[in-house]
A protein has these predicted regions:
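Hydrophobic helix-and-loop "lid/oligomerization" segment in the mid-to-C-terminal part
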Residues: 142-195
Length: 195
């Protein structure tokens, strides 16, 4: 997010340190948008993106029921703001397309992260035929040091930076595909159907 682009990232679970932070994500056991606290690790937490979101027109509101992770919480509150420049700068797409891309990005990118982080199996109660170990969450997890590798604070912080770059790059690429390929193709198909 642009407003935190130059911020220092503090990786801690110390509540006194967290209290000094402008925004706290995935730790602290608090979800409160007013104080910018975005953790989903409470027994009582059950928020989903399908809940009413004030910035999304009713017709475009997602009907998703996957419990949000910290990723989904940040997307819920800042996704529109983050997507707008990516859509309008250089692509020539109208800002009115934002709710459509917001919903599509959740369905095609963020919901998977939410489900995996919350332990939701893709097959529900059915037995899995195979495991997927190459998804974004798995690749981010593979950036953690192995048990027999050096894993001090400096190393972990550097690897966290790599994980942020990986996730951010994939998010940006997914938005790019939607705005430069999916939406233009959809418009062509709709025009052909209308003829």
């Amino acid at each position: 997010m642009p407003q935190w682009a130059g911020s220092t990232i503090v990786r801690t679970r110390n509540l006194e340190e967290l209290a000094k932070c402008d925004i706290v994500i995935d730790v602290g056991a608090v979800y409160d948008h007013a104080t910018k606290r975005y953790d989903h690790h409470q027994r009582t937490f059950s928020s989903v993106l399908g809940e009413v979101h004030p910035d999304v027109p009713e017709a475009s509101r997602p009907d998703f029921s996957t419990k949000l992770s910290a990723c989904g919480l940040v997307y819920k509150h800042y996704g529109m703001e983050h997507l707008l420049p990516a859509l309008t700068e250089g692509s020539g797409l109208p800002a009115s397309l934002l709710p459509v891309i917001y919903k599509k990005m959740y369905k095609g990118f963020v919901e998977e992260v939410d489900a995996i982080d919350n332990g939701v199996d893709i097959a529900g109660d059915a037995p899995l035929k195979y495991r997927v170990n190459t998804n974004l969450s798995a690749r981010v997890g593979q950036l953690n040091p192995a048990w027999n590798e050096e894993g001090g604070k400096e190393c972990r912080n550097a690897l966290f930076g790599e994980a942020m770059a990986l996730a951010g790059g994939e998010f940006k690429a997914a938005v790019g595909r939607l705005s430069t390929s999916w939406w233009p193709a959809r418009a062509i198909v709709e025009a052909a159907v209308d003829k």
